[in-house]
Amino acid sequence: KESAAMKFERQHMDSTVATSSSPTYCNQMMKRRNMTQGYCKPVNTFVHESLADVHAVCSQENVACKNGKSNCYKSHSALHITDCRLKGNAKYPNCDYQTSQLQKQIIVACEGNPFVPVHFDASV
């Protein structure tokens, strides 16, 4: 079974590109990473930084998560990310996403030993 840490990597890590220059990036990646199976995941963020840099966020600024838990961490610096948002008229199985390239701080929930990201909470 896929661990929470592995799921985070599948859903949120794309270290192979510095940015998502293509407007079809989200449509391709959401499908490739199995987030359009059975339904269209409405919102997802990909991080274009090294896995080591994203793991390091777990030792940066401790902040509250959206759900009230206290195991979220905010990156010190802005990271290259891509926001994928399902377009209003898109219906499964034709998941059609808006691709937005951003540089923002990220907030992730971390747990385990090693202490690694298991949930993408927000970008700010």
Swiss-Prot record:
Question: Annotated Gene Ontology MF terms?
Answer: lyase activity; nucleic acid binding; ribonuclease A activity
Which Cys-Cys disulphide bridges does the record give? 26-84, 40-95, 58-110, 65-72
Q: Name one Pfam family in it.
A: RnaseA
Q: Where does substrate bind?
A: 7, 10, 41-45, 66, 85
EC number of this enzyme? 4.6.1.18
Q: Which SUPFAM superfamilies match?
A: RNase A-like
Which tissues is this protein detected in according to the database? Pancreas.
Q: Which InterPro entries match?
A: RNaseA (IPR001427), RNaseA-like_dom_sf (IPR036816), RNaseA_AS (IPR023411), RNaseA_domain (IPR023412)
Q: Which CDD domains match?
A: RNase_A_canonical (cd06265)
Please list the coiled coil stretches: none
The first-level EC class reads lyase
Q: What GO biological process terms does the UniProt entry carry, in alphabetical order?
A: defense response to Gram-positive bacterium
Q: Which UniProt keywords apply?
A: Disulfide bond, Endonuclease, Glycoprotein, Hydrolase, Lyase, Nuclease, Secreted
Q: How does it assemble?
A: Monomer. Interacts with and forms tight 1:1 complexes with RNH1. Dimerization of two such complexes may occur. Interaction with RNH1 inhibits this protein.
Tell me which family the UniProt entry assigns to this protein: Belongs to the pancreatic ribonuclease family.
> What is this protein's function per UniProt?
Endonuclease that catalyzes the cleavage of RNA on the 3' side of pyrimidine nucleotides. Acts on single-stranded and double-stranded RNA.
Protein name, as recorded: Ribonuclease pancreatic
